[in-house]
A protein has these predicted regions:
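A beta-rich soluble binding module of mature secreted/lumenal proteins
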Residues: 2-9, 14-136
């Protein structure tokens, strides 16, 4: 009888914790991904240093990370990520594109492996192109 009562009291507590966790998970998914509405792609090209990030597989454990963007003659963007890992320089070369420059100038796509592209959203950009907030 005592075990049954303990389980009976524990069930509402577990249900409440589960509901709270589900709400927190939902809050995590509701990130504002509104991108900038104007972008001069030529001004965006160049070297950008990372101040903070969520690690991607190719940046895990890296420090002094920066990315260089260069516009290619075919309109694609060359992307080179560089950094230091275990005291040694590392780099990965990828490609980027701007699928809808007129409708969604701040929504780009970046690929570091074959034809698999990830979202690259410019969420904020300084008017002088001195800093940017990027998400996916």
């Amino acid at each position: 009888m005592k075990t049954y009562c303990k389980l009976l009291y524990a069930f509402p507590l577990l249900a409440a914790l589960f509901a709270h966790s589900a709400c927190q998970a939902n809050n995590h998914l509701k990130v504002n991904t509104t991108t900038i509405t104007q972008l001069d792609i030529n001004r965006y090209m160049g070297k950008w240093y990372e101040i903070a990030r969520y690690n991607h597989f190719f940046e895990k454990g890296m420090t002094h990370v920066y990315t260089e963007y260069s516009l290619q003659p075919n309109g694609k963007i060359k992307v080179i990520n560089r950094g230091i890992k275990d005291g040694k320089p590392k780099e990965i070369i990828g490609k980027g594109k701007q699928p809808s420059p007129k409708e969604h100038p701040g929504q780009l796509k970046v690929s570091f492996f074959l034809w698999f592209y990830s979202d690259y959203y410019i969420l904020e950009l300084d008017k002088d192109y001195q800093y940017a907030l990027v998400g996916s």
